[in-house]
């Protein structure tokens, strides 16, 4: 009771006492919804909420919106996307782009032929013998996973009891459903050691909607992925607090208070009726959150991979070549972590995207050293005249493939995860809660916004 009584002391009295003692009183902003994170999900939610007449405050640690959706512009203003390179061509995507008046078109990769190289030896090889190309492989795969229709929208809406085939290692699923000749094509759309992954997570990388999108083609903003987020930034204006991080979060059924600190040290108190968290719910990301026992227990279970997206210039690689990694010593040609997945040619001469994947200890320094090592190896073997490149951008997409054990899934982990929605005026969305593809994340975010509206 004493705490509740104290909370009603006049604000002016508290401010006067604070000023008299040299304490800075943070400015206060009141909004309907406070959003943590302005990546793909957070930005989409902010625009949708504003369209519904809600007021928002969006807290973002970076100096830009869009998270992994970054674009580098060359001197002649050619947009080079790295990380997110396109969106599924669905009504959700088209409506969003048109809402923000962002011109878009079909995503076409830069013209190039693919060279298959074993990056453990630095030597050229071939597409893994006996492995199907994408279209044929996906047809077999879709037939095998069509039994899990509850995953078709990318959300972890898993039936209980959990089907055992969903939580066996992918290598076992492959043998059971005679998919041995489809593995390499499927690997190229996942992130991690695919043979050891639980089948559920492979489906969340390349499931029914993903295969359909690959067949139908992607779309992308003509002026680069960043154009979408620049337009959203103009719409949101001062409702976005860039280069700002939450310091403390207080939540109850009556509303939320979030104290944030900007890059210059200024503190601001954000008061809202609801909180929408779009950042990955790892315990290390939730400092300042007094989590419930249920939240702490669930969020402590996560494991994940590290994923780095490098945009490099002047590698010595030809401009008309994509390098695809094939490990000729491993089953189905699938590399083991850490590995470079691909080196892709770009739309401007000299530029390539490099995608690197590793375990939880594959940090930025390790990833850069690994990249240099493999480029050196290509030179030493005489495969290409490669040399140390200029790193234009080196972006972290960590954590990627956030996962839990088969035992946790069998025990109802995802049901318990979704039961957190709405507790203490707090809602959650983002890549942990649905397949990590923007179009699917936007679809799930729409569901969450409906829950918020009805709570």
From Swiss-Prot:
Q: Where is the signal peptide?
A: 1-20
Q: What species is given as this protein's source?
A: Aspergillus flavus (strain ATCC 200026 / FGSC A1120 / IAM 13836 / NRRL 3357 / JCM 12722 / SRRC 167)
Q: Tell me what this protein is called.
A: Beta-cyclopiazonate dehydrogenase
The keyword Flavoprotein is annotated on this UniProt entry: yes
**Reactions mediated catalytically:** beta-cyclopiazonate + A = alpha-cyclopiazonate + AH2
The cofactors required by this protein are: FAD
**GO MF terms held by the record:** beta-cyclopiazonate dehydrogenase activity
Q: What does this protein do?
A: Beta-cyclopiazonate dehydrogenase involved in the synthesis of the fungal neurotoxin alpha-cyclopiazonic acid (CPA). CpaO carries out the dehydrogenation of beta-CPA to yield an unstable enimine product, which is captured by intramolecular cyclization to create the pentacyclic fused scaffold of alpha-cyclopiazonate.
Recorded hits in InterPro entries, A to Z, give: Amino_oxidase (IPR002937), FAD/NAD-bd_sf (IPR036188)
**SUPFAM superfamilies associated with the record:** FAD/NAD(P)-binding domain
